[in-house]
Amino acid sequence: MIGPHWSKGWIVEDCDVSHSKCSGISLGKYLQPNNDNKWLKWKYKDGTQTERDAICQASYEGWDKEHVGSHIIRHNHIHDCGQTGIVGHLGGICSLIEDNDIHDINVRQNLAGAEIGGIKMHAAIDVTYRHNHIHHCTRGLWLDWQAQGTRVTQNLFDHNSLPNDFKVDQDNIDDVLSGLGEDIWIEVSFGPTLIDNNLFLSERSIRFAAQGVAMVHNLIAGSFTATGRGTDNNSVNLPSNRFTPYHEIHGTKVMGFMTIQHGDNKFYNNIFVQQQLRPEMQKLAEMKKDEPDDWDDYNFEVGTKPFSDYPTFAEWDKQFDGYCGIYAPNSDHYYSHLPVWSAGNVYLNGAQATAKEENPFVDTADQVKLALEKREDGLYLKTNLYDFVPEKTDGVISTATIPMAFEPEEKYENPDGTPITFDSDYFGNHRDGVKVTAGPFSSAVETEQKLF
């Protein structure tokens, strides 16, 4: 319905955008006639290869932050669209998407497959998603390829999966799975992707088909799924790695390609809460618990436990002892999982930590309640969470304390290259002192404030 068409600096503000059969707002790319749906029309190159071709061609034909992107999409009500609320491919770089209410996207399932979500963007380089409410969508936010320098901060995600009244049985399970979404899907990206001070209240929080993600000061009440999978390309007998580009720091020039090794993720000062699944979702979980596929492991257990088999930095670093170079002994260490860092996290209601996290706070005895309460002036969090969360137990996180994203060798910093100190919370209130409390709120009293 609204599209800048490969231009720069549009502002879409205070609009009601609804009932598009496809997408509400498009931040897409220009037409490349030689690449127009080439996978379908020419057939001989897989879509992942034609995607790489399109990216490289665009970088030779004017795709840079001086000419494209830097849009502002804010204070909009975007709802009841068939495919996406906001969509973008290359054309949304360096944009700010904030204070939008995005809901009821793809809930009718009249369109299915890829490119579905409240927001779906390829190459969200240096894009900031701030203080949006994304809810009641098949999927909340889908960051596909090159989420480099991307920041997701101070957002509220809820009810982004199957509808409340869904039913599942052996006859309809394939149709049901096509609508099994999550709050965020990060796919074939090397980061740095920064996710901080958000509330994830859907039953599935993050689909981790990527690496280089840092999660800091979030409330996470859903599971991590697709850990270590979802990055190959559907071959049957032969390898089909998706070679993925990474870029110059805060720019679009392609610096190299690599396969996804998984790992290189960082979890600091988050609160994990295991929610009780809806009865029908529990039934679905039981039906699929022993049937993972190449794209999803159907995990519904909350916490960092899926990363238990990943090395710590010390374990990974030890592989490189001694001589490394030509004629060194053959080794897999350049292609194995990258390390995972985890510290300062709180695990409640049976949420589980990675086996290698040192001194996590785990409370399995008490029962935390989480619910959204809709009042006349907006949404509030109804919870007893801070009856059990310890106060001021861990240090302040900053750009300097987070290891850089491995493949692009880029720090978790602002788009202008300045460092970030995570001393502001979901509401923008200051976290005082050298020790801070885990989660998106600086203190318990803030749970009484309006979320959105």
Question: What are the language-model segments listed below?
Answer:
Residues 5, 89, 122, 415, ...:
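Surface-exposed loop/turn and secondary-structure junction residues enriched for glycine/proline
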Residues 259, 368-440:
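C-terminal accessory segments
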Residues 1-5, 9, 18-395:
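Glycine- and acidic/polar-rich repeat regions and solenoidal domains
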